[in-house]
Curated annotation (Swiss-Prot):
One of the primary rRNA binding proteins, it binds directly to 16S rRNA central domain where it helps coordinate assembly of the platform of the 30S subunit. Belongs to the universal ribosomal protein uS8 family. Transmembrane segments: none annotated. Part of the 30S ribosomal subunit. Contacts proteins S5 and S12. GO terms for cellular component: ribonucleoprotein complex; ribosome. HAMAP family: Ribosomal_uS8_B. One of its GO terms (biological process) is translation. Gene3D superfamilies: 3.30.1370.30, 3.30.1490.10. This is Small ribosomal subunit protein uS8. Keywords: Ribonucleoprotein, Ribosomal protein, RNA-binding, rRNA-binding. The lineage of its organism: Bacteria, Pseudomonadati, Pseudomonadota, Alphaproteobacteria, Rickettsiales. Pfam families: Ribosomal_S8. InterPro entries: Ribosomal_uS8, Ribosomal_uS8_CS, Ribosomal_uS8_sf. One of its GO terms (molecular function) is structural constituent of ribosome.
Amino acid sequence: MALSDSIGDFLARIRNAQLAMHKTTRVLFSKVNSSILKILKDEGYILDYQKEVVGNIPSFVVKLKYYERSPVISDIVRVSKPGCRCYSKYKDISKAYNGLGIFIISTSKGVMTDYDAHKLKFGGEILCRVF
């Protein structure tokens, strides 16, 4: 069966693994997922990730992060969906949760946070919201 929304599946796997208090989870490999994982690591939402090939299928193993036995990622939501894309100009990008969270945006210059997109004056598709 083909996967229609790889980013949605990726976010659901991370959300479900954190709610179940797993130390690691496995997500499918893609360039967009790689960019999102890099942002999550740089922003301190996950410990680490590495590429792994199992049975000729590439995937990422993500080490999840917890603080005082509760997940660091309390909310990770897909904003732009395959049936309803959500685009924003750089002027219209607001801060997620009054600056406590981030939006991850796909721009013409790659995937970046809302802060970086606003600083570089790039708009784009809002992929997800992380808090």
